Amino acid sequence: MGPPMKIEDVRRTAYSMPLTNPAFPPGPYRFFDREYFIITYRTDPEALATIVPEPLEVAEPLVKYEFIRMPDSTGFGDYTETGQVIPVRFKGEEGGYTHAMYLDDEAPIAGGRELWGFPKKLARPKIEVESDVLVGSLHYGSVLCASATMGYKHHKVDHDTVLKSMASPNFILKIIPHVDGSPRICELVRFHLDDVVLKEAWTGPAALGLFPHALCDVARLPVREVISALHFKADLTLGLGSVAFDYMAK
């Protein structure tokens, strides 16, 4: 048995919950062979306007629907993720706003929500190769909510183009409630991907279907036209964030 826990001990060791056995370890968080499958599509401008918060501005009526396979990550392990990222501008700088994410692993859900403010929910995303097709799917429970396909490795993509897009800032709306349910933290968080090593990048013909669901509303941003598709692998570090805008500041 150790000594009794003092107030100073709580302040010194507090990081995540449970206090003595946190749901995720401290970073840095390095990802190896992180696999992306991204379909960029055109959607309704009116739908985007109801979702993207000020002071962000919608750059174009586009959405990037992303599937990400993470077989080897420090602290977070082996998992798959999917979600929607919206191209935006913040003070004249172009970046991406992460609107919603769905994944299958507790540690990155807890860490993502608590540290950065990622809008993560538990679901069953999947990436796999079926014969000559790259397939991405999202099930929420037993219900199919998203289905994406792409011709497998048809054409190489210029690495500089992909690296430039990965260097852009990313934005998230972090919300942590007070004990009475009112917002205690409400911030626009900015983060970057660091130390990126791009291993391969491909494109091909693609299709995307989004289907209505009450609690997994990816179809709220409907697909009007598929613009492009991208499939690539990289090693990278998920950098910690900074506060770009504080909604609670007077």
From Swiss-Prot:
- Write out the catalysed reaction: acetoacetate + H(+) = acetone + CO2
This chain's source organism reads Bradyrhizobium diazoefficiens (strain JCM 10833 / BCRC 13528 / IAM 13628 / NBRC 14792 / USDA 110)
Q: What does this protein do?
A: Catalyzes the conversion of acetoacetate to acetone and carbon dioxide.
* Sorted UniProt keywords: Decarboxylase, Lyase, Schiff base
- Give the record's family classification: Belongs to the ADC family.
This one is known as Acetoacetate decarboxylase 1
Q: What enzyme class is recorded for this protein?
A: lyase
| Catalytic site | 120
Matching entries from Pfam families are given as: ADC
- From which domain of life does this come? Bacteria
The molecular function terms of the Gene Ontology recorded here are: acetoacetate decarboxylase activity
Documented EC number(s): 4.1.1.4
